[in-house]
Design a protein with these regions (language model features):
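Sec-dependent N-terminal signal peptides
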Residues: 3-12
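Intrinsic low-complexity/disordered segments
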Residues: 14-16, 399, 436, 440-441
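Intrinsically disordered, low-complexity segments enriched in proline/serine/threonine
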Residues: 13, 40, 414-416
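Beta-propeller fold recognition
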Residues: 17-398
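C-terminal outer-membrane/trafficking sorting elements
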Residues: 404-411, 415-488
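A general lysine-centric signal
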Residues: 2, 334, 477-480
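Long, low-complexity intrinsically disordered regions
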Residues: 396-401, 407
Length: 488
């Protein structure tokens, strides 16, 4: 039998994990890292799109997820989600973003689930003028015979209106949940959403750093990447269209979701910053500029013991020929560099040793030829601290059948001092109980019947989740009320 095992761990960049091993980006460009080195592929659907009446959208943001073997599950460009067969996923069209958003989308597995994924999107300034905001859809990978689909009624759900094109995620300090992070437009506010096994359960707002301004009627100051360090303790963002330009890094508490202690590393108010990435060991920060200040710059976050003045003084130009745009850390431990937005420039740059200081980071220009397919502005958006340990490609049973659901009885509801689970199946199952904060308060393996003492639990709503070895997932909620009265 298979048992659910949840391991608490510190967020690390795990080179052994393969869920970020396939990339689709740019103008039908792609890379496959499953062999250990990137292999160029061109079979994806991500590409330039018509944004009439505004023209052709630049290819900037996409998101992809694979299973633990590196096999593709699905991917998205902000407006459309495709399944592993490169067909539009069931209910996967008409998402409210476009590929022209810097970080148009982010795919996050629901903690504790091998079946459900959250697809987050941020709108773009070019085609939509940011009107659709920050939204999410829930994907059930077992729909459509295992090809996956967006659940009816769980699509384009609004979390926050008018955000920038910045979107990233961090593993929670508990090693299970995630923080999904965006930046409010025309504000200095970070909004951090906690995703747990029961859904989005908490929002933390931190007012820190620069206001991302509206300049006249123009929302183009929403562009630029936001990234988290692999250990989840730092954030960095850039905005090269603002006046003055913005380049900052922050402390991030991945237990509370609080952003604090801004440090500005903007050294020229006219530079056009776009891309940002941390090294795998969290010690170096890279920033890419296009147009004014074109180049890739390294900042040593350990300089002077992390003293901000020393960090700014450590700035080193490591690449300086083209208009450099998006940066992305890959599972091979290297940082990939989009060199130019123009069609016809089909080469990527690579920072081969990003942990090393200065030019010893070994930037290689034109390192990868994409076979005529331009990278354009950016790369797929990943959580660099992913462990993906609960991402499973198998979907043996598909959607839980009604007969399976009817096998489970949870009583009494409301409950007081005892809660009972009755599962009319002779197989072992694992039941987990979570409070409204998403904290697991109970986990137990049983066969057929289990009754547990709940006197220690506070009154309130609790969420249960049942799993068996067929990866069937059944969920529900129960209410804890005061002590039961004994009848006489």
């Amino acid at each position: 039998k298979k048992f659910l095992i949840i391991i608490l761990f510190l967020p690390l960049f795990c080179f052994g994990q393969k869920q970020g091993n396939i990339w689709y980006f740019g103008d039908h460009a792609g890379l496959d890292f499953n062999s250990g080195s990137p292999v160029v592929i061109n079979n994806g659907q991500v590409g330039l799109i018509d944004c009439s009446p505004f023209g052709t959208c630049h290819a900037e943001g996409s998101a992809i997820i694979c299973d633990s073997s590196g096999a593709l599950l699905f991917y998205c460009d902000g407006s459309t989600a495709w399944n592993k067969n490169h067909q539009i996923m069931l209910n996967g069209d008409s998402l409210l973003s476009t590929i022209s958003s810097t970080q148009s989308s982010l795919i996050v597995p629901q903690p504790g689930s091998s079946r459900y994924f959250y697809l987050f999107t941020t709108d773009d300034f070019f085609a939509h003028n940011l009107q659709y905001g920050f939204r999410y859809s829930i994907i059930d990978i077992c729909l459509d015979n295992g090809l996956g689909g967006i659940i009816n009624g769980e699509k384009n759900l609004l979390l926050l209106d008018t955000v920038t094109e910045k979107l990233t995620g961090v593993r929670h300090a508990n090693g299970v949940d995630y923080w999904i992070i965006v930046h409010k437009f025309h504000s200095d506010a970070f909004h951090c959403y906690r995703l747990s096994s029961t859904g989005i359960i908490d929002t933390v707002i931190s007012h820190v750093g620069s206001v991302h301004p509206i300049e006249g009627a123009n929302t183009w100051t929403a562009v630029g990447q936001l990234k988290a360090s692999p250990n989840g303790q730092k954030l960095a963002l850039v905005n090269g269209n603002a006046t003055p330009a913005i380049a900052e890094y922050f402390d991030f508490d991945n237990n509370t979701g609080i952003v604090s202690n801004v440090v500005s590393i903007q050294t020229n108010p006219l530079w056009s910053y776009y891309g940002v990435s941390f090294s795998p060991d969290n010690s170096k920060l890279y920033i890419a500029c296009n147009l004014n200040g074109n180049g890739v710059y390294q900042f040593d976050l350990s300089a002077g013991g992390g003293n901000p003045t020393a960090v700014v003084a450590s700035k080193t130009l490591v690449a300086g020929t083209y208009n450099y745009l998006g940066l992305q850390l890959a599972t091979d431990g290297k940082i990939y560099v989009a060199r130019s937005p123009f069609v016809g420039n089909s080469y990527l740059g690579v920072i081969s040793s990003p942990n090393n200081a200065g030019t010893s980071c070994n930037y290689v220009d034109a390192a990868i030829d994409l076979n005529g397919h331009a990278a354009s502005y950016g790369f797929p958006n990943f959580i660099d601290s992913y462990d993906y340990s609960n991402t499973v490609s198998k979907c043996e049973t598909g959607i839980a059948e009604q007969s399976d659901i009817e096998k489970l009885k949870v009583f009494p509801n409301p409950f007081s001092t005892q809660l009972t689970f009755s599962y009319a199946d002779n197989e072992q199952a694992v039941v987990s109980l979570y409070n409204f904060l998403g904290q697991r308060v109970l986990q137990q393996t049983f066969t057929n019947y289990m009754s547990t003492n709940t006197e220690q639990l506070a009154n309130g709503i609790y969420f249960y989740e049942l799993r068996n070895d067929k990866v069937t997932v059944m969920k529900g909620k129960v209410l804890k009320q005061g002590q039961e009265k004994t009848s006489r």
